[in-house]
Amino acid sequence: MFQVPSAGEIQELIGALKTGASAFVPEIFLSGLFLLVVTIDLFRIPSKRTIIPAVSVIGLIISGYFVYLQHAIPPDEFFLGMYAVDPFAIFFKYLFIVSGVFAVLISIDSVEVNLPESRSLGEYYSLIVAMVLGMFLMASSTDLLMMFLSLEMVSIISYILVGYLKGQVRSSEAGLKYVIYGSVSSGLMIYGFSIIYGLTGETNIFAINEFLKHNEVDSITLMLGSLLILGGFGYKAGVVPFHFWSPDVYEGAPTPITAYLSVGSKAAGFAMLIRFFRVTIPTGAGSTDLLAFDWVTLLSVVSVVSMVLGNVVALWQSNVKRLLAYSSIAHAGYILLGVIVADDLGTQATLFYLAAYTIMNIGAFFVIILISNEIGSDDVNDYKGLGKKMPLAAASLTIFLVSLTGLPPTVGFIGKLMIFSALLAKGPVFVWLAVIGVLTSVVSLYFYFKIPLNMYLRESEDGSETEFNVGMLSNALVAFLMILTVVFGLYFTPLSVLAEESVKIIGAVVMN
């Protein structure tokens, strides 16, 4: 029977809302920005195609300022323990804003996004803003219900954006496949949540930790629930065996959305995975201790298989977007190596790598968009002679691919170095993981460098050397991302310090 809340409970709820509102300013602002973009789209304004992306970019940058102000808030829980503000969440919010801003910017010159048969641009850009909002919530969620709702919010928006090109069969097919895979993974995850709730009677992850430390529950059931939850997070992060959606979705989606999913969605998945497992794993050694299960071995196997499968299958890909999809699976494996370490050094390496991956992967996809605009193809074999036709784009893409491989002097090299160093510092047991990481990076050299091989060492079939006319804004953005890739490879201290300061997670424990 429904019970009317008491005056004290109502007062407590109002107090929680008032306290939480001050910590929720970035999310409130993004909600307003979403409504503003939708509203602008309702009016017949001649320059609407310019105004909407401009408003979106400016709004996202302003939201970054509000995130910056959160540094002054002591790490704490808000909204009755459903939402946290801590350095860890703030770091990911910066990452989501950067990926969102560049998703908007690279969409401006994308021919496929601006096709006449495409949906409303206001709808497109407002959904990018809404997705940033959803990822904000994912990074700060400290309650099973909030985790599920925020992940579903991001997933549903992703389904729409992947199928944005309604006039193209491959986009609609990619959207449908994404919905099917996403629905299955969401079902698995919510079932895992229900098992954890059934065992503990709690949805707050800190309360779950406390319950498991002081009470006995069935270990097998607990492991089953945790594995199902891992499946849900793994789907968003794109690790094996939850990767099946990646190749088809990356190939069929509009390229700016492919770039956005490859960095923003992946980072959000890892944010939830790291927070959940570093907080809910209790430090005790009782029969219900999650550490009674060898999580390190399980995650190590997932990481190794992701690195091997992603890099090996990419060897046979001729479509650039599909190639980078398998590359993304491999990089998810590298990132997972830092998660396995599960201490501050490992978390720092993970955060640094995610930031590095955001820069170099968005840069690579941006160049692919510019090339596709000119030649109308994503096939590697059609890249012949582009070193002369698009000199800046070709040089930049080569730098991004060098960074994705993990070679100096790029930020990708520093990222992998930090991951492998964290593994070696953890102990000799983890050396084999670092060795496999290095070997799979060597394998990636082949499929990454067949792209520059075509651009510089093979002539185009038409024999033409006439340069394509790429816009000034596009060239400036590509050059900026290329410079960041090299500069952070040579002078990585600012990014490393930011990652180091962002490892503080409320209630986190170390997995031994």
Swiss-Prot record:
Family to which this protein belongs: Belongs to the complex I subunit 2 family.
Keywords of the record: Cell inner membrane, Cell membrane, Membrane, NAD, Quinone, Translocase, Transmembrane, Transmembrane helix, Transport
Chief location of this protein within or outside the cell: membrane
GO biological process: ATP synthesis coupled electron transport
EC numbers: 7.1.1.-
Subcellular location: Cell inner membrane
Alphabetical list of InterPro entries matching this protein: NADH-Q_OxRdtase_suN/2 (IPR010096), ND/Mrp_TM (IPR001750)
Membrane topology of this protein: Multi-pass membrane protein
Catalytic activity line of the entry: a quinone + NADH + 5 H(+)(in) = a quinol + NAD(+) + 4 H(+)(out)
Domain of life: Bacteria
Protein name, as recorded: NADH-quinone oxidoreductase subunit N 2
Pfam (any one): Proton_antipo_M
Segments crossing the lipid bilayer: 23-43, 50-70, 88-108, 120-140, 144-164, 179-199, 220-240, 254-274, 295-315, 323-343, 351-371, 394-414, 429-449, 477-497
PANTHER family recorded: NADH DEHYDROGENASE
Keyword Membrane: yes
Gene Ontology CC: one annotated term: plasma membrane
Its biological purpose: NDH-1 shuttles electrons from NADH, via FMN and iron-sulfur (Fe-S) centers, to quinones in the respiratory chain. The immediate electron acceptor for the enzyme in this species is believed to be a menaquinone. Couples the redox reaction to proton translocation (for every two electrons transferred, four hydrogen ions are translocated across the cytoplasmic membrane), and thus conserves the redox energy in a proton gradient.
Keyword NAD annotated: yes
Subunit structure: NDH-1 is composed of 14 different subunits. Subunits NuoA, H, J, K, L, M, N constitute the membrane sector of the complex.
Single GO term (MF): quinone binding
